[in-house]
A protein has these predicted regions:
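C-terminal beta-strand-rich structural cap/linker in extracellular carbohydrate-active enzymes
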Residues: 672-695
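Carbohydrate-binding surface patches
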Residues: 219-222, 618-657, 686-689
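Polysaccharide-binding surfaces and accessory modules of carbohydrate-active proteins
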Residues: 2-249, 266, 666-669
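Short, well-ordered beta-strand segments enriched in hydrophobic/aromatic residues
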Residues: 129-137, 499, 636-643
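Short Pro-Gly-centered flexible turn/kink motifs
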Residues: 92, 270-289, 685-693
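Active-site neighborhood of glycoside hydrolase catalytic domains
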Residues: 369-371, 408-561, 571-573, 582
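Aromatic-lined carbohydrate-binding/catalytic grooves of carbohydrate-active enzymes
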Residues: 309-443, 449, 453, 464
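Glycine-rich, aromatic-flanked loop segments that form ligand/cofactor-binding clefts
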Residues: 58-94, 218-243, 285-304, 341-347, ...
Length: 695
């Protein structure tokens, strides 16, 4: 028997126990567990390693793992083409506990024989942690790295004493235009991640999204679940460029890590001059005793909440790219009766009849907006804050700025200007002249014309690489970092400005962009029946208080359709659009009733926790069954239900823990009896909502 010697350093943060494991070679890893389950930890590191026996299926094998993974360019890769994670050559140096205005936590320093240092900072915030990983070059020469993790949760699950067959699941969330947020749940066996007979050469699952649409394939959030114990570990990245996550089996346990896409994923290489450092994107991690939604909720609770839940009107689904000044004033005359706070001019204001073509100069077309200052003045006098749409990161065919004479200011790949579909090119935000130009065209324009809201759209993906750095992936990362800095500058220059984050709907619903903006467009599913399905999906991925959900109302909509649309929007922030100037009085009455109900939901949307139940089918485009969204705080419960095709059946929700009726919105087929909410007689594409309060 070979004895593994590991020492532990333990820290307790409210309900979470953090332990750092350090072996005799000074390799260090970290486990986090719910404090209430600390005594159930199975210390595989204290179990003897038996003599190798190829026929022993239960032969104990354990690997300590790491708290951070890094790879020096040119050094050997243990499993090339598969994973760049391995023993890093970084060993434990020192550790310190800290308390600051940002929270409390632990800083761990790892050292490398060549003079490099990794600084790993774990900060406790509201039931979870942020992780910041910094590579410091204290050597006497420059160094190139081609992989650096943001976080690493190793030794999963610490509650199992062996390789735990049939006890683990891995949960990911899929992106896709107008199909955002589908949960993909697979056992580790379905991922072909069983432990091998030898305990080494085990598998991994590396995934992520490449390019400038960070939620195009997957969302940068995932959950590892021990279904036997009922514990979930979740992680989320702040990254608006190419990112990756990886679930790797090392012997009996798993390593769950993530960060920037590495060289094998996207060709990333970063040069760090001597005396300088580089920080990986910030990560959020949590560990809960509960379900996937509990773990995701713990991640979201660490991030900024909305200040308000005011309703937004956006005229896009009213004019479909043909806004005018007269139309906006006419709409606002009706909107003020509904108490709408923001009214947004969407695409089409630069050139009449051109929704997205010819953008780049950002000059108002005075044939359709003859006096924009007077318009915004009138809107404010009606109590409505004016907003306007930009896609300022690009130029499009038909604009002077799209022409070749401005190519020197554009992003290039292999010397050629990056264009999508041949009609959209991209400013290089690393250039000062680009930032200065857009300061005048965007920030000064907003200031001088009285706008208090900007919808920032982004309708193209640059692809993986941009010239001008040590690797194409690093060029793109730095460009998108500068884009984010421009968003921050808008808020610095106009402190009261409300900024909406949009990228063909939900392609930028990641934490680094959502946390510096006020709200985000949930999807481009403007009028689709799957709106409530998508909106509910996203409760695991973003704060509902920042989730702007379309409610498009047309003059030929019947009561059921209006209620269906409004109830879907109650799952986040209401974004009203449609024939607002053509509705009949009875239709306005439904809107007024709905908005009165919505005003009562502020606290529960901001601070609640969501569970989705019912029997909805797997297709979003052709939904079936019934979706019931339950959102709870300690004092309130919101129930929003939607019927799709084949929506027969009766559904019961237990409220025996003390909730009573407070208000409802067209919940005519729901009743409260014997400590239950009973929903029955659902018809296709109908909906209702109930608000309850604790006795």
């Amino acid at each position: 028997m070979n004895e593994v010697i590991v020492r532990e350093k333990q820290y307790v943060f409210e309900n979470i126990d953090v332990r750092y494991l350090i072996d005799k070679d000074e390799n260090v890893s970290m486990i986090i567990v719910p404090r209430e389950l600390s005594e159930q930890i199975q210390k595989q590191w204290n179990m003897p390693i038996p003599k190798f026996d190829a026929r022993d299926r239960n032969m104990h094998r354990w690997d300590i793992g790491n708290i951070a993974y890094a790879h020096i360019f040119g050094e050997p890769i243990e499993q090339p083409g598969k994973t760049m994670k391995a023993n890093t050559g970084f060993t434990f140096f020192e550790q310190e506990y800290f308390e600051s205005g940002k929270g409390e936590g632990v800083v761990t320093y790892l050292k490398h024989i060549d003079g490099y240092v990794i600084k790993h900072t774990l900060t406790y915030i509201k039931g979870g942690f942020t992780v910041e990983t910094e590579f410091v070059n204290n050597s006497d020469s420059d160094v190139k790295i081609d992989m650096l993790s943001s976080f690493a949760l190793d030794n999963l699950s610490p509650f199992q004493s062996d390789d735990a067959p049939n006890k683990y699941k891995f949960h990911r969330f899929l992106g896709g235009w107008s199909m955002e947020g589908r949960r993909l749940s697979q056992s580790v066996e379905e991922l072909n991640l069983d432990r091998t007979w030898a305990g080494f050469m085990c598998g991994n699952e590396k995934f992520g999204t490449r390019g400038s649409f960070p939620c195009n394939k997957y969302f940068p959030i995932a959950v590892f679940e021990d279904t036997d114990i009922g514990v979930c570990w979740a992680a989320q990245l702040e990254c608006n460029s190419t990112w990756q996550m990886e679930l790797t089996r090392f012997a009996n346990t798993f390593s769950f890590s993530g960060g920037l896409g590495d060289r094998e994923f996207c060709g990333w290489v970063k040069n760090i001059p001597k005396g300088k450092s580089f920080c990986a994107p910030k990560a959020y991690v949590s560990c809960v005793r509960g379900k996937v939604n509990d773990a995701c909720n713990a991640l979201l609770n660490m991030q900024p909440n909305a200040d308000e839940l005011s309703i937004v009107f956006n005229e896009y689904c009213t004019t479909w790219g043909k806004p005018t000044q007269d139309k906006m004033i006419s709409y606002c005359q009706r909107l003020k009766e509904l108490g709408i706070k923001y009214a947004v001019i969407d695409a089409g204001w630069c050139k009449a009849g051109c929704e997205q073509d010819g953008n780049g100069e950002w000059n108002i077309d005075k044939t359709i907006f003859p006096n924009v200052k007077e318009m915004t003045k009138q809107m404010r006098e009606m109590g409505i804050i004016p907003g306007i749409w930009f896609e300022f990161e690009v130029t499009t065919d038909g604009s002077v700025m799209f022409e070749p004479r401005y190519d020197y200011m554009k992003l290039k790949d292999n010397g050629k200007v990056i264009k999508t579909r041949g009609i959209r090119s991209y400013w290089d935000f690393r250039r000062e002249d680009v930032r200065d130009y857009l300061y005048e065209k965007v920030i000064r324009f907003l200031k001088e014309n009285g706008f208090g809201y900007i919808k920032v759209d982004y309708n193209g993906n640059t692809g993986l690489w941009a010239d001008g750095a040590e690797s194409g992936a690093e060029g793109l990362r730095r460009h998108l970092e500068c884009v984010r800095e421009f968003f921050i500058k808008m808020k610095q220059e106009i402190p009261d400005l409300v900024v909406e984050n949009c990228a063909s709907g939900g392609n930028r619903l990641e934490a680094s962009m959502m946390n510096i903006t006020d709200l985000s467009s949930f999807s481009d599913a403007h009028e689709a029946v799957e709106i409530p399905y998508i909106a509910a999906n996203l409760h695991n991925l973003m704060r509902p208080s920042k989730e702007l959900v379309w409610a498009v109302i047309h003059s030929d909509d019947d009561k059921d359709r209006i209620v269906y649309s409004l109830c879907a929007a109650f799952l986040g922030r209401v974004c009203l659009s449609g024939d607002i100037d053509k509705l009949e009085n009875w239709q306005y009455d439904i809107l007024k009733r709905g908005f009165d109900f919505y005003q009562k939901l502020s606290d529960i949307i901001k601070f609640g926790k969501t569970t989705v139940c019912g029997n909805r089918g797997k297709s979003m485009r052709h939904p079936t069954g019934v979706q019931i969204v339950i959102r709870k705080t300690e004092s309130e419960m919101l129930v929003v239900y939607h019927g799709f095709d084949d929506s027969d059946g009766e559904f019961e929700i237990d409220i025996s823990d003390g909730y009573i009726f407070s208000d409802s919105f067209y919940a005519d087929n729901a009743e409260i009896a014997d400590g239950k909410i009973i929903i029955k007689d659902m018809k296709p594409y109908t909906s209702g909502a109930l608000l309850l309060e604790r006795k």
